[in-house]
Amino acid sequence: MIAFIVLLSLAAVLQQSSGTVDFASESSNKKDYQREIVDKHNALRRSVKPTARNMLQMKWNSHAAQNAKRSADRCTFAHSPEHTRTVGKFRCGENIFMSSQPFAWSGVVQAWYDEIKNFVYGIGAKPPGSVIGHYTQIVWYKSHLLGCASAKCSSTKYLYVCQYCPAGNIRSSIATPYKSGPSCGDCPSACVNGLCTNPCEYEDAYTNCNDLVKERKCQTEWIKSQCPATCFCHNKII
């Protein structure tokens, strides 16, 4: 039987005759498969070209996984409402994959990553208009909390969802999802196998917080509340 797979926002339907597995055996509730999903993401993040000087190591997050499960259980090939994709202070991004047969999680993640063929670092989508958002979310440097889940919607419809916190794919930075340079160049004292392990626990509300803090310092409650990462996360990846 030929399986079809679809990635959200991808207009074409892709066909594949191998890679299918028993759905129950691939449950993301199992610790082994959580480890497989995290390890697959980290291996891909570690292997980016050009190399990344600020790429954070991903870790499994149960709250993100619960949110992903609720999203998958809707059995709707559409992103879940943004307000339902939060973990603590972080807003979370989301990748969705649909297939007519069950797939191994490593194959799902690889399918998202394979959009790299239409991505050029520093330029973005090439040719222009190509879908690259699943790839860029996987390699977004500061997305370090990961949770995934799947749902069997029918005998011919399987939905896979991963959520990433904090969210990536900031439009103004989509061509540079990480800072190029020597691996762990921005975290020499907090590095494990080429990935940084010093994430900031805060998230700035504005992309120009560096400029705001330079101008006004972190002396007002407004600045501290709107730019907490810039104000408080020294020597961390923000």
Swiss-Prot record:
InterPro entries: Allrgn_V5/Tpx1_CS (IPR018244), CAP_dom (IPR014044), CAP_sf (IPR035940), Crisp-like_dom (IPR042076), CRISP-related (IPR001283), Cysteine_rich_secretory (IPR013871), SCP_CRISP (IPR034117), ShKT_dom (IPR003582)
Tagged with keyword DNA repair: no
Keywords noted in UniProt: Calcium channel impairing toxin, Disulfide bond, Ion channel impairing toxin, Neurotoxin, Secreted, Signal, Toxin, Voltage-gated calcium channel impairing toxin
Main location: secreted
MF-aspect GO terms: calcium channel regulator activity; toxin activity
Gene3D superfamilies the record matches: CAP (3.40.33.10), Crisp domain (1.10.10.740)
Database matches in Pfam families: CAP (PF00188), Crisp (PF08562)
Protein name (database record): Cysteine-rich venom protein 2
Organism name: Hydrophis hardwickii
